[in-house]
């Protein structure tokens, strides 16, 4: 266990950030899953709608440092390509 006051504070801060990051990452996965499920159901309208909802969430996660910027870009690209296969 930490002995310094600053180290104890950092432990508390890290715990708070961990919960926040976990929540954001979980929500991110849910949005991505919604897009994939809509594509599997061959529902083009729902897939496009889900993609439009997912892109800002992915970008925000990258901005906050939850995921790497390149990972966010890759996710958006792959999901967009997937939705475009429906026509």
UniProtKB/Swiss-Prot annotation:
InterPro entries: Ribosomal_bS20, Ribosomal_bS20_sf
Keywords: Ribonucleoprotein, Ribosomal protein, RNA-binding, rRNA-binding
Record's GO cellular component terms: cytosol; small ribosomal subunit
GO biological process: translation
rRNA-binding listed as a keyword: yes
Family label: Belongs to the bacterial ribosomal protein bS20 family.
HAMAP family: Ribosomal_bS20 (MF_00500)
Function in brief: Binds directly to 16S ribosomal RNA.
Name of the molecule in the record: Small ribosomal subunit protein bS20
Source species of the chain: Geobacter metallireducens (strain ATCC 53774 / DSM 7210 / GS-15)
Gene behind this protein: rpsT
